């Protein structure tokens, strides 16, 4: 299924002049794959993926594989306590393995993907909420639920497991039911207030589920676009909630990817936001715009926004990826080959960095333009 047909019908009506595009690259781009847009040429995988980049990715993935627990109550997780023991980090690590080309049935990280899936499925509650029982961790909420649902959707598309299908269907149903009246989601699984940082996690997961063959109602899609519109500002940036709040690279990139996930790829709002993101590229953004606390979260969505924009603005992608690649490798990486995160931990930082660095491989459908 062409991911750019997702939410095509009612989403276009809700978004007015915003129009969808065709895809840019086939999944699993080879070293010789290059796209010409009639403007600047989109750089090939070989041009972007230096030898050093591949080496540090491999080192990061080996670290994650080593950290994964293979037996006991936390089998499949990446720690016995803290965020590493939760579904969010497990899902992100699983996505990092998938981004390398491994699947549930093949590849060097096949076993690790199976363990990630096993752990997440074990934590799907009867309501469909995906969360381990320890609710003291901040990621044991709708962040984790969204990342877990996104990961399971990708695995389901590759394996069609029956247990996975049943539990994922429950998670999708619950997510749709707790969307609030403004069209967004919040930290806990109740339909009260909303914010953009949580909404992106849910709408991207729903898009992935839809592409894997699950039903997502037009009403949910339309309401999501309406909520994202309320968070958009005239200068192209996005604010934390419809009422206001902080503005940052993380939120602006999340807003753009929310539009993409809702089937919207063009229009004045997206153009303004892409320009805003590009103007705050690595080396240009201030500490206020990209705080250390949200660094990986910001660049996880920013690299997707630039990657999806390559047909309209190949110069954005051609500039952005080398900048974030070099920053992650030369400035953010520890001597042991991991990416530290003072709040969540190196498992999280390493998983996020490996996803970001592997985007040009184009192996995972939900990340594909």
Spans of features found by a protein language model:
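An alpha-helical repeat/solenoid feature that recognizes helix-turn-helix modules
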Residues: 33-59, 77-112, 125-173, 177-222, ...
């Amino acid at each position: 299924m062409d991911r750019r047909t997702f939410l095509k019908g009612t989403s276009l009506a809700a978004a007015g002049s915003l129009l969808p595009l065709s895809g840019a690259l086939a999944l699993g781009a080879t070293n010789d794959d290059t796209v010409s847009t009639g403007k600047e040429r989109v750089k090939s995988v070989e041009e972007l993926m230096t030898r050093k980049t591949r080496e540090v990715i491999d080192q990061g993935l080996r670290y994650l594989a080593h950290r994964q627990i293979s037996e006991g109550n936390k089998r499949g997780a990446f720690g016995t306590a803290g965020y590493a023991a939760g579904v969010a980090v497990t899902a992100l690590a699983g996505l990092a393995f998938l981004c390398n080309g491994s699947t549930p049935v093949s590849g060097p990280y096949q076993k690790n993907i199976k363990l990630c899936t096993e752990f997440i499925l074990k934590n799907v509650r009867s309501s469909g909420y995906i969360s381990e029982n320890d609710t003291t961790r901040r990621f044991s909420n709708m962040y984790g639920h969204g990342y877990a649902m996104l990961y399971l959707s990708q695995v389901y598309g590759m394996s069609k497991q029956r247990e996975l299908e049943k539990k994922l269907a429950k998670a999708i149903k619950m997510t749709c039911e707790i969307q609030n009246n403004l069209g967004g989601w919040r930290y806990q699984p109740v339909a009260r207030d909303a914010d953009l940082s949580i909404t992106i996690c849910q709408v991207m997961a729903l898009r992935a589920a839809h592409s894997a063959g699950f039903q997502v109602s037009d009403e949910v899609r339309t309401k999501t676009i309406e909520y994202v519109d309320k968070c958009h500002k005239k200068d192209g940036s996005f604010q934390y909630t419809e009422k206001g709040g902080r503005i940052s690279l993380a939120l602006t990139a999340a807003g753009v990817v929310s539009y993409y996930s809702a089937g919207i790829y063009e229009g004045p709002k997206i153009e303004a936001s892409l320009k805003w993101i590009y103007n705050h590229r690595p080396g240009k953004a201030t500490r206020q715009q990209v705080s250390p606390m949200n660094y990986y979260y910001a660049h996880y969505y920013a690299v997707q926004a630039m990657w999806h924009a390559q047909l309209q603005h190949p110069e954005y992608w051609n500039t952005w990826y080398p900048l974030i690649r070099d920053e992650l490798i030369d400035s953010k990486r520890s001597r042991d080959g991991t990416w530290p995160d003072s709040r969540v931990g190196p498992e999280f930082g390493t998983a996020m960095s490996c996803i970001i660095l592997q985007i040009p491989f184009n192996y995972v459908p939900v990340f594909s333009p």
